[in-house]
């Protein structure tokens, strides 16, 4: 399962089959970050000559349609990570007909973990293999509650639960959320994936600020 698919699965509420209301932009940014992280971990791309840039290695082919499309976005929008992350949703849609969220849940549906998308205004993906989500959530809770070093895949996934607004899922005990938030915020510190975590958060902050400014302008 791709890192982005794992995050999408955690974001799906088992009761509704949907992610939290109004969180698509935040989740899409995090999914884009995880797709790029996956490409780095697979050695399809590597950090570039400057911070915040990446380059195709030419050593490894991307695995599967989703990562192949994500690689095409990297080639088209790169080398700057910010442009790649900003363009991922539209880039995937242009290449495979699905945006970032729909691409990842389609992968989950193909694997039999969730049902195919259904519904109109607010589509849903009911869980089929709830134990898969339970296992992923349990691993994230263990990582968030601990103090030890994490492998890069776990670090990447844990890092994105913060900006994806999944803290309450990862740390259901309110008293433990301070520690969990610290683990999430610093999960990628000093790693090759740190620029991705930083830029995802920046993009979300900029989008929130722009939306706030637009609201003020519309009401003034």
Predicted regions located by residue number:
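Short, amphipathic alpha-helical interface elements at domain boundaries
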Residues: 1-93, 100, 213-220
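Charged/polar, solvent-exposed surface patches and flexible loops
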Residues: 9, 69-73, 83-86, 90, ...
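Hydrophobic/aromatic-lined pockets within catalytic cores
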Residues: 12, 40, 44, 109, ...
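Short, charged low-complexity intrinsically disordered segments located at boundaries
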Residues: 38-42, 99-105, 135-138, 170-172, ...
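Accessory beta->alpha helical hairpin/"wing" motif in late/C-terminal subdomains of nucleic-acid enzymes
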Residues: 49-72, 115-145, 151-157, 174, ...
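Leucine-rich, amphipathic alpha-helical/linker segments
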Residues: 73-107, 146-174
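Acidic, Ser/Thr/Pro-enriched low-complexity segments and adjacent helix/loop capping patches
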Residues: 85, 90-99, 111-127, 131, ...
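Short hydrophobic helical membrane-anchoring segments positioned at the boundary
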Residues: 141-220
């Amino acid at each position: 399962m791709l890192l982005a698919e794992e995050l999408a699965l955690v974001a799906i509420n088992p009761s509704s089959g949907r992610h939290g209301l109004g969180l698509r932009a935040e989740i899409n940014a995090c999914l884009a970050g995880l797709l790029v992280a996956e490409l780095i971990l697979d050695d399809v791309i590597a950090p570039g000559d400057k911070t915040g840039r990446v380059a195709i290695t030419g050593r490894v082919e991307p695995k599967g349609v989703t990562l192949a499309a994500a690689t095409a976005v990297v080639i088209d929008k790169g080398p700057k990570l910010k442009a790649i992350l900003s363009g991922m949703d539209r880039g995937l849609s242009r290449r495979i007909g699905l945006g970032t969220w729909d691409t990842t849940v389609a992968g989950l549906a193909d694997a039999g973990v969730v049902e195919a998308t259904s519904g109109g205004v607010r589509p849903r993906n009911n869980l089929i293999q709830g134990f898969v989500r339970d296992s992923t959530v349990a691993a994230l809770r263990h990582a968030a509650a601990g103090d030890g070093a994490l492998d890069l895949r776990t670090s990447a996934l844990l890092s994105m639960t913060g900006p994806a607004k999944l803290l309450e899922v990862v740390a259901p005990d309110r008293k433990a959320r301070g520690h969990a938030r610290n683990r999430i915020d610093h999960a990628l510190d000093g790693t090759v994936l740190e620029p991705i975590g930083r830029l995802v958060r920046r993009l979300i902050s900029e989008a929130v600020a722009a939306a706030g400014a637009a609201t003020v302008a519309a009401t003034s």
